């Protein structure tokens, strides 16, 4: 049986037996290991190295009505991404976001995965060849049309998209590359 549980509640649900396993972003896999109630069967990096991950999404109406705010939002994400991608800043970021008002997870659990230090909970420890990346000289946050088109093809493949669409046109309308370029240019972020 599949159930939907918010990521921060997954460890607690495992602990009380409401679920036997889960697929989730960090730090919740590491938290289950740290708490001694789970292990990591595989990481998403094992399945698809450097895969697209989270999305900052806004409606077209928001972008049209508040273009400066939308641009500033992108700039804030780019600045934060550049900061976090610097390994020397990751410990302070882990400390900041570990607080109960943010992620509410132990700082050490967050920090180790930030640094690419993995422990699967059943005896294997390693330094990940593809640790979390947030900026990588502007490549990570760029809204690649190829990613958008790939996701659309998968929606079609798995029956979530019922009719044929112009994948490129849809990806262009969603990805807002021009707005991204404006924001990136103001910060001297390279455009891939």
Language model features: what each stretch is:
Residues 33-66, 74:
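Periplasmic-binding protein-like
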Residues 65-179:
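Secondary-structure end/capping motifs
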